[in-house]
């Protein structure tokens, strides 16, 4: 459909429907567009536009570029606007106002700051004749398709940095373009509406709604480019903003036949069939060629040229028949088929358009020199420009853009006639589209060649979306015809390459130049530019020729490596070759372009005022509008902007790897370096460059290799997110200043944009010094390592306030230092380290910490130790103070990484432990070490590192190290009240080395840590907070333990779970100060300063520090009430003597602190190792004791006490221990933490002993008595009665007992039973719920079946995780169970007011606990399943080895025997279960007694038979064992013994778990039903 060229461009309100489809469908609308308003779409009221165009470039964001040439563009009124001249006032602009443009620019800048660079890049490349020649190197359409393909591939490559894919671009078109460009589009669309430029979605643009439409249409364009007007809008804008290589507003000119799917249009549209590709003028980003829009500006060239593609889709030929003379310059059917890429390539677009314009103008000038100035700009407005500018552009269908190539191409050669512009008439009015920053300014100056009213037929050719890939720019006048098809194609990139296009050099005006703010005086300016252009032209031309030659020689040989492109309509050269060639060409062209740009810029000054605006916009994608630029943005003056814009564009564009906008392939660093060099050499105006740096440079920095998302960095600009450098980097420099500096550097690196924002104003010169092009300098930004630091940590946050050691209350001041110094290191360390610094740090830290504490329970723990390096929980650095207070200043190990020299010393040792421990603090930064390594590490050293160790490591890596011996005598004496240990430990766990070590120590969860010398032990546990440093105890840090209490409790490390719970619970930090003070008193007590060498000594929990209780309440409660068992009460006596109850491996090893009164062993124990181990053990044991053994009244009391302790100092003081607290989950850890902190103070005042009954369930029994003895031994005694003995034996045997033992019940199970019994006592007799809670007791299967496996078979810890499976299982279970228990304890800590409320409360807690129990059992069930798989693999390996050495029949015997063992075991267990159920029923169901008895008799018979079978199988097993002994090594025989027995054990354990899970679920269902009924 032709678009009638109306001189009356007065239809300012022409349908904004200038979508391509409109173009297609609304010839009449197009008619409305007056010829004069060739660029009318983009034009605003000539007056307003002119004024605007004179000073400000009408910039459109990429999205709006195509859609709207800024008012400036076509202001025929403005004398500067050639169009204005030609069109006269008829180019009434509808739409874009400067305010709108600015708004759009702002938006675009905010969204796509980096786009500016993209544009800059693109303009340079597009300008380069190299690209032009490259694009049109082969006249044949096939060659073009090949180029397109190359572009595609290149784009894909460069897209990596930009993260653009064709699809992405097309999709983004709608999204990204819409946001910023659309508003502009809306305005522009108004102006567009006159011309109904195809592109602006609903160019009607009268309504912003349309603008939005445009954005959405852009996406649709990408899809089908359809005939949706919206698509048009979007397309142009997309084209502008899209990162497509060319994404020029008027890229239509570069239509090649082979535009298969190279461009977005092709990709979005399947219409790649037209293989004619427009090589978008945005060649600078050749990669984005797919996005290139096809725009034929030459009237001369026959539409036929591109008709193949064009024919594809019926193109709406917007044939403005420019009559001429004045507005006759009809824009050639600029089919703007921008494949709009989502990015906001407005800059690109403007650049591209400009190049295109230049080319077109050149051609036009070449046809009509007189007009060429205007034409130049006119042509420049390529797809987008044309879309915007061409009066008939309405037809310029977005579909064209969609088709990126094809659409614009005039689909109908027939329409050519309609365009029927005489060659002479072809003077397309010059349409200049300047897109800078996010603005696209399209200036359409109808070229005066009055005599030659060449009808610029915008054969937008609505080539249906189909012809999208086919740029049918065919409608070219005979004159254009004269230009070879290639010329037309060149024309397409013309402005980009600035061919010597016949006629003024102005045509060469690089995009920036021709793209003045508006068409204002464009002709005049262009001439000014022309000199630059002229100078460049020859160069460009020579470059183009050279490139063409190169392409012809290499790319021109496509047939050599030819293959059919996807549409199979054209042969394309080897894609790889193309990519290489394209990259080379692009790089070369960009360099050339850059140089020429600079030269032109130098020449430009004449037209700088206008050009500068355009240039600036281009160069300042971030500065949405030139004015937006931080530099003399306000001044639209060309000089500043000119310089700045030219320079900035290339580098930023290049740099914009981060920005999708920076789609230009030329974004490679090398290219940028070259650009920089070129710019530097040319002496680009640095001022402008700096200014560009403000926005673009920031991006370029990012591009440099820092790929922070452009938008976020912008947003963050103000925010100095301090990303701590990696621990490795900062480990050496532990100074706060270093950390801060690093943070700043890292932040800059990571958020170069932000920094740039600041920089442009503040230090733009810094980056700019490199030259605008050198924005690429970003590579010089701080090394990536720092960025890693940045990313890794924020110094502010990472430094949690050191856990306020209760004892070290004076220490809180350290918080600031500590935090800063620690910056990533655990502040807890600081606590132990130099007390004074720590105190300081603590003071500062707390404020920062608060954030972290809340966020991470682990961080809270970190305060204690395990938590993150920060002391988030209470931000109280007091724990550290505690250390300080303690005579021992050695705590340095606890000090943050960046600490004083003393701290450094400690750190040196601590680093080891830290690495072992891996606290969130420093540990996070430092490379993590394996748990084993950590375990191996000396606890003393480990402490500091433990502090660093992240909780994650502690939790995740916590391996029960069974034989963790208190390497140092400094281990906290197990004697210390568990409450203290636990509390402190929890705190320690998070932050303090101990806390962190807890997990690590867990491995050696030897409470014994007997090596801990009492002296050191106390200081380490300055309350939960200190716990972090605790690990250092042994070294100087333990001593620093607050001497406040002679009893420097060296607390044994509690189980990792404890640590976890501590982490979970703010307990770590809860008593940071108070807890730590009291705790460290208590800790000593707890640790009992047993001789370091005496792990066995019974821990004498000292009741001294009540605060210990708080600490323990936090950690203990969370871990297990039992651990808190040693209540804050000075006398923890209620707790059974810490006869360490060691439960066999699986069984919980419980250590009851018998010496509750044991005054805090004043001897400060070296807590380093013992603390870690003890903490681990304590944690684990606590959970176990809590669940299983805390059932004892004393244990219950312990529960209550811990809870109370943490909640209230008074509780700690009181023998809260007495009130049994059922262990419950410690959900309210943080709140507790706070409470405990408060209470900690009280606790500090109130000494109390918390005995700690630690039950550790694991195959290895960790005896975490308050005693330092570490009974990692997996002592699995069936009876709790045996536990004491076992514990004793364990202490002696240590790890000797690691045999297969029956599954031990989890602490949570025991806790639940205890809670159930308590609740039943409160219920009235006969209550339904009581019946549910007291299910009938069945005899254990062990009474019916025994010897299912040999319990004497040693565990194979090394071989199977399963070996420790029970242990591991129990550990994991205990950790979770302990945490849950803690919550319950806390809740139960306070007695209920009324019986009814009490019952309801207990019932709720019981149900919650039951749910937790089920979850825990299921988790264990899953673990057993994994163990079974591992064991089966072991059996398969043995079978495979045996099969290699024996006959198949013998090997089959082995397999048969293995299967038989599994079957008989399952059978015996099943029969025993049924027997137990039957006999249990006999007692209750008397009426069915007869039937039940007969059933029981039958089962006995079956059982006897099964026993006989079992004995037969065992005999066969002996023969199998003999077979193995003959053929396999002793180790393999041992493996077999283990395998066969483990198989039976796992079957038994799995059945036991299944039964318990089923029963628990039934009980839960019954309870729920009963409660519902009772409530009713």
Swiss-Prot record:
Disruption phenotype: During axis elongation in the embryo decreases localization to adherens junctions and planar polarization for both Rho-kinase Rok and myosin regulatory light chain sqh. The mislocalization of sqh impairs the generation of sustained actomyosin contractility during cell rearrangement and can account for the reduction in the formation of multicellular rosette and convergent extension. RNAi-mediated knockdown in the embryo decreases Rho-kinase Rok localization to adherens junctions and planar polarization during axis elongation. Has no effect on Rho1 localization or activity. Keywords: Cell junction, Cell membrane, Coiled coil, Cytoplasm, Cytoskeleton, Developmental protein, Membrane, Microtubule, Phosphoprotein. Residues 1305-1572 form the ASD2 domain. The keyword Phosphoprotein applies. Residues 1-31, 46-100, 112-142, 187-244, 267-434, 589-609, 621-660, 699-728, 743-823, 849-876, 910-939, 1036-1055, 1091-1116, 1210-1244 are annotated as: Disordered. One of its GO terms (biological process) is cell morphogenesis. The ASD2 domain mediates the interaction with Rok and is required for apical constriction induction. GO terms for molecular function: actin binding; actin filament binding; kinase binding; protein homodimerization activity. Gene3D superfamilies: 6.10.250.3120. Residues 1232-1296 form a coiled coil. Residues 798-816, 1094-1108, 1217-1229 have a biased composition (Pro residues). This is Protein Shroom. Residues 1230-1239 have a biased composition (Acidic residues). It comes from Drosophila melanogaster (Fruit fly).
